[in-house]
């Protein structure tokens, strides 16, 4: 199976991008990483699978350094740089920039694949663009399935890291897809019942 992993390169400087152990319920024992998507890859990539990584990077010196750090971690998993695609954009929040990014992400996704996306890093607008691109690709691609949406959460107290966890937030993506069916349902409760059923029967 071709598994595609979509992530955003963090804006933090190198000194602020520390390695974390992102705990995840039901996963293989987590290992320290700067990038939650690396833990997702460890959890989902099976023998015989092919991995492709798409990265969204706003162009500046910090993201260029962080991109190299990601390549190093991916190489440790046996994923070469030739399997990684950069989607770059300027450091602005202009509507045309974000619309272009949405199109670029959808175009870069393979026609037949299972996609896993990490929405931890980047400006607040980029997760919105990411989810919109996935919705578009699911509708237009031959056989594209969203396997999971993840968010890496770090809890701190008094400036010190207490814990880090990898949260599966796929249910929120599924909710956005079901909302369009509210008009055809007697009550919104029917939509949420569908959502619960889907989340309980989702493949990994």
Protein language model features and the residues they cover:
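Long, low-complexity, Lys/Arg-enriched
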Residues: 1-114, 135-204
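Detector for conserved single-position "signature" residues within domains
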Residues: 117
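Short Gly/Thr/Asp-enriched flexible loops that form oxyanion-binding sites at enzyme active sites
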Residues: 124-139
């Amino acid at each position: 199976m071709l598994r595609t992993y979509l992530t955003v390169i963090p804006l933090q400087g190198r000194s602020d991008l520390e390695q974390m152990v992102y705990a995840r319920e039901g996963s293989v024992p987590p290992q320290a990483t700067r990038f939650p998507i690396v833990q997702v890859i460890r959890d989902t990539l099976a023998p015989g699978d092919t991995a492709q990584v798409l990265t969204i990077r706003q162009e500046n010196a910090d993201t260029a350094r962080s991109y190299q750090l990601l390549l190093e971690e991916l190489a440790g998993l046996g994923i070469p740089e030739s399997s990684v695609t950069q989607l770059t954009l300027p450091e602005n929040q202009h509507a045309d920039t974000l619309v272009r990014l949405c199109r670029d992400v959808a175009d870069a996704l393979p026609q037949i694949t299972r996609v896993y996306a990490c929405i931890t890093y980047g400006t607040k607008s980029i997760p919105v663009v990411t989810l919109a691109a996935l919705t578009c690709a699911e509708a237009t691609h031959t056989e594209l399935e969203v396997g999971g949406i993840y968010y890496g959460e770090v809890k701190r107290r008094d400036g010190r890291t207490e814990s880090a966890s990898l949260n599966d937030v796929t249910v929120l993506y599924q909710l956005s897809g079901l909302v369009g069916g509210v008009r055809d349902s007697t009550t919104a409760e029917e939509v949420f019942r569908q959502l619960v059923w889907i989340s309980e029967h989702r493949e990994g």
